[in-house]
């Protein structure tokens, strides 16, 4: 068995981007004595965490899913966004048998096609050109009853982007076959991932029953009125669009086909479960239509659903390599990022490797995380210090969600507090490692909190950034420096630190400079 330092830690500070401009920079504005000391006393480098470096289109901001996939894979992983874009360009998208089957069922049943998902150019969960391609495909195949159920972003893009996006979408629909927007819902409701079923139910009910607190004659009015209520895009209450008789334009009914065009799994699962699971118990479904439900990508490997772009298996990811060497590993995070240190870090696979323990700390049950910027970081730290001291683990992977999740709120003061809370936790963890000769790489998956104000508009900036991220080596003096690199270089670096040869599938390179 390879000789392991006990333990070697990978600490991922979600949303901890690197930016030298101080204005709107919660990272630089915060008091961070522990991180400052580490930067001063230990080797560090910058890593690319966006665009082509993580398998996304050039210039596109990074995100947590893609970041953790690249970290765990040790190679650039070409993301669903890129794969789908290529299929549209080469025409394969319009021949996709899963889409064609959904359309053929609509024709056979004289029913409706419903396109549900996030209307956003953010490229994190969805991408508007993919919706455009589906609308074009429906027109090409002669469908007359095509309805869009628009989830609004305001998180991966500025908080009041939806009105302009909806206007453009309506114009596109008029030019390409007349698809109609039937409902709008903020992603806070339609894309919850923390089992806050009361939110998911509101989205489900507007889709299946046309039942909602608000209604509007068109989607633009729905968004405008939501702004008037003080709601930004993410928080727009589910709203049904009605016809001249004030009846819903469309609801999802028996024999309809539904295409969920989000390509990222974590925030698509709950609503999908509500539609398709026989044993669903999140809430009482007043109506459960019998439909043909298509997922753009694989949302849940336990569900036998048609998937337009199936998962591409990654072999010899970090967790698998460690397990093959007989090493013990721990993955620890709070709810908001638990999937990232497990599912995504393991190459998009649900399976747990032999020797892999997992620790989930519940995220606080509050409306928005600016109300509790520390989130569950202190509880995570209590637990991980105990696990470090146990001597059980060779490798520990930890994620602190604070800088990303609080950064998404756009509340600068809260983001500063989030950074400071994480810094306190880093101080405790480093001390625990020092006592037993442990080693750590401290890094991030993408930026966020370093840019809380939009430099062009002066408005709050709630999205991720395309800035690089730091990687700090904490340990003994054998590592003299770190080379600039990409997120995919982290796994090879960890393997070198622990004395394991890099598998041929890992094309990333070690960051270590030892001479």
From Swiss-Prot:
Enzyme Commission identifier(s): 5.4.2.12
Cross-referenced InterPro entries: Alkaline_phosphatase_core_sf (IPR017850), BPG-indep_PGM_N (IPR011258), Metalloenzyme (IPR006124), PGAM_B_sf (IPR036646), Pgm_bpd_ind (IPR005995)
Catalytic activity: (2R)-2-phosphoglycerate = (2R)-3-phosphoglycerate
NCBIfam families: pgm_bpd_ind
HAMAP family per the UniProt record, alphabetical: GpmI
Cofactor or coenzyme needed: Mn(2+)
Pathway where this protein functions: Carbohydrate degradation; glycolysis; pyruvate from D-glyceraldehyde 3-phosphate: step 3/5
The gene coding this protein: gpmI1
Single GO molecular function: phosphoglycerate mutase activity
Binding site for Mn(2+) 2: 14, 64, 445-446
Keyword hit for Calcium: no
Sequence positions that bind substrate: 125, 155-156, 187, 193, 264-267, 337
CC cofactor note: Binds 2 manganese ions per subunit.
Protein name (Swiss-Prot/TrEMBL): 2,3-bisphosphoglycerate-independent phosphoglycerate mutase 1
Family as reported in the entry's similarity comment: Belongs to the BPG-independent phosphoglycerate mutase family.
Function recorded in the entry: Catalyzes the interconversion of 2-phosphoglycerate and 3-phosphoglycerate.
Catalytic residues, chain numbering: 64
Organism: Methanosarcina acetivorans (strain ATCC 35395 / DSM 2834 / JCM 12185 / C2A)
Domain of life: Archaea
One GO BP annotation of this record: glycolytic process
Keyword match Metal-binding: yes
Residue positions binding Mn(2+) 1: 404, 408, 464
Cellular component per GO, a single term: cytoplasm
Enzyme class (EC, first level): isomerase
Alphabetized UniProt keyword annotations: Glycolysis, Isomerase, Manganese, Metal-binding
């Amino acid at each position: 068995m390879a000789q392991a330092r006990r333990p070697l830690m990978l600490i991922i500070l979600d949303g901890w981007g690197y930016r030298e401009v101080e204005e709107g920079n919660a990272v630089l504005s915060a008091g961070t004595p522990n991180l400052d000391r580490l930067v001063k006393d230990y080797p560090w480098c910058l890593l690319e965490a966006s665009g082509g470096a993580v398998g996304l289109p050039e210039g596109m901001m990074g995100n947590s899913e893609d970041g953790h996939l690249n970290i765990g894979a040790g190679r650039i992983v070409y993301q669903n966004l890129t794969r789908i874009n290529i299929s549209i360009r080469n025409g394969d998208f319009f021949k996709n048998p899963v889409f064609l089957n959904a359309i053929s069922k609509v024709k056979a049943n004289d029913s409706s096609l419903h396109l549900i998902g996030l209307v956003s150019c953010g490229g994190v969960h969805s991408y508007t050109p993919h919706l455009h391609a589906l609308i074009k495909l429906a027109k090409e195949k002669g469908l007359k009853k095509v309805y869009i159920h628009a989830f609004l972003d305001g998180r991966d893009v500025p908080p009041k982007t939806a009105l302009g996006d909806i206007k453009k979408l309506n114009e596109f629909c008029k030019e390409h076959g007349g698809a109609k927007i039937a409902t709008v819902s903020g992603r806070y409701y339609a894309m919850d991932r923390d089992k806050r079923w009361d939110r998911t139910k509101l989205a489900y009910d507007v889709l299946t029953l046309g039942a909602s607190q608000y209604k509007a004659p068109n989607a633009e009015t729905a968004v405008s009125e939501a702004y008037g209520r003080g709601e930004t895009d993410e928080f727009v209450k589910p709203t049904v669009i009605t016809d001249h008789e004030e009846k819903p334009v469309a609801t999802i009914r028996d024999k309809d086909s539904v295409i969920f065009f989000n390509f990222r799994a974590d925030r698509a699962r709950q609503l999908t479960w509500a539609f398709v699971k026989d044993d669903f118990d999140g809430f009482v479904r007043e109506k459960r239509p019998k439909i043909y439900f298509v997922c753009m990508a694989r949302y849940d490997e336990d569900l036998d659903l048609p998937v337009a772009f199936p998962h591409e298996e990654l072999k010899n990811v970090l967790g698998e390599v460690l397990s093959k060497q007989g090493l013990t590993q721990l993955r620890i995070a709070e709810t908001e990022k638990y999937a990232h240190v497990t599912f995504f870090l393991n190459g998009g696979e649900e399976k747990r490797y032999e020797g892999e323990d997992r620790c989930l700390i519940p995220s606080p049950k509050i409306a928005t995380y600016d109300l509790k910027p520390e989130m569950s970081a202190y509880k995570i730290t209590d637990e991980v210090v105990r696990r470090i001291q146990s001597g059980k683990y060779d490798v520990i992977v930890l994620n602190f969600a604070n800088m990303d999740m609080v950064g998404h709120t756009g509340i600068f003061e809260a983001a500063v507090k989030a950074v400071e809370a994480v810094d306190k936790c880093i101080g405790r963890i480093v001390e625990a490692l020092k006592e037993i000769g442990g080693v750590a790489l401290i890094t991030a998956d993408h930026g966020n909190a370093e840019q809380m104000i939009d430099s062009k508009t002066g408005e709050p900036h709630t999205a991720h950034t395309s800035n690089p991220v730091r990687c700090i080596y904490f340990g003994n003096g054998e590592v003299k420096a770190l080379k600039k690199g990409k997120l995919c270089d982290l796994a090879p670096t960890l393997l070198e630190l622990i004395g394991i040869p890099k598998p041929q599938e890992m094309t990333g390179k070690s960051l270590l400079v030892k001479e």
